Amino acid sequence: RGLGDVYKRQALITVDKYYDAALQHVRSELIIDGKLSRDNLDKEQHAAHGLSWIAAYRATLKEMVNWAESLDKDSAFNETEQLMLQIIFSEYCAQIKSGIPMSQLEYVRPQDLGLKNGLFQENGTEEFNDLILNGNSADDRMKLAQLLKDGFSSKNFGNSNLDETTSIIRDQFRKFVEDDVTPHAHEWHLKDELIPMQIIEKMSEMGVFGLTIPEEYGGLGMSRFVDCVVTEELARGYIGIGSLGTRGDIAAELLITGGTEDQKLKFLPKIASGETLPCAVLTEPHSGSDMGSFKTRAVANGEHYTITGNKTWVTHGARSDVMMLLARTNPDEKGYKGLSMFLAEKQRGDDDNMFPDDGISGGEIEVLGYRGMKEYEMAFDGFKVKKENLLGEEEGNGFKQMMETFESARIQTAARALGVAQSAFETSMQYAIDRLNVTGQSLYDKPRNASKIVSMATEIMAARQLTYYAAREKDKGHRCDL
């Protein structure tokens, strides 16, 4: 606890200096005559990606301090939370100084960003370096390991700092998951089945699909922050369950930010109630997520647009009722400007007849994981969409409309990852406690095993606080990207 001043006054100051210097270097490499050079961005991919990691570490450490201070005000900053804060600070500061692992074989180090290690030897960094040396000791890790073990039966792995209302909502969805999802999820996965409709209907009754839709359009009007908490609990049971709401989120955000009032009134209440299941039809073969190279065409023809082209990796494509379909309405406009977004209504398919509409064909793409909604490739050959279903009833805005929704979708993706990570953590810990070695000793009693569990717990808490921060920033109307 005595290291609190180090966190706020020294460690973060040093991290800020490092980030500012890294940002200045990357800008000098990428900005030409006041504009981003795409050629230079390709050339300096490592540095640019490294900068994003440094920014994420910096924001995470700041949010961990905010988390700690908030708990402390409520006299809830106990030994578990204190050790988590101390260990994550020590570990992240050490990585910032010596190299952040961006993947198993890729690191970003100060020299990759034009910086020298002398930055970490300047006056005012003594506490930063002392924290690296002394904040993550074996004794402290074993203390936290014991606290986590003591809290295992009650699932007390540190205080996430939720208010009373949000805690009640979380507990409601946790019970739903434990009663209706967890007992069946593995069987759904092994059989590669669509999530049963009765589960979707129960989720509809609980308001999952209308959480963030305004009340005037049939939703609950809750915050992105609450949506994150709910999504984490759903994904903790089964990632497919946690992902179901994302389809509705993308569709709702598109409508709220870019739809006409008639379009909002037509679609939002049905999305909120779960009556209409949306899907996003974006990615194209050989284009990936490079929307500027999309070739699927939408040609105006009387009261309709005629869609022709191919799409792939369409999640929940067969069982959906409306597609958020991105197509090129102006072939003379290269890149992003000629794209338009459509609310393309279709009939709901099933395993026996995936795409019953005229003008659509396709098939399932088998996947190893992330099951429950299934992935599809879809071919459009003269498929008709009503002109009134052009989002915003104005051509050429599709890319802009789509990008306005991606921040919210990525925040929810982070919440899903938290749920999966929490499930993996709890499963790992249960196994380590229960499994005995040949001498009859629990695997958890081996320091190296317990230390891995400690790393999982601290990383998850840190990622959770960063995700909450991004959601709260979005709720305030702020951008939450780099």
Predicted regions and their residues:
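Alpha-helix capping/hinge segments and adjacent helical runs
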Residues: 67-69, 73-76, 80-161, 165-167, ...
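A short core secondary-structure module
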Residues: 304, 308-358
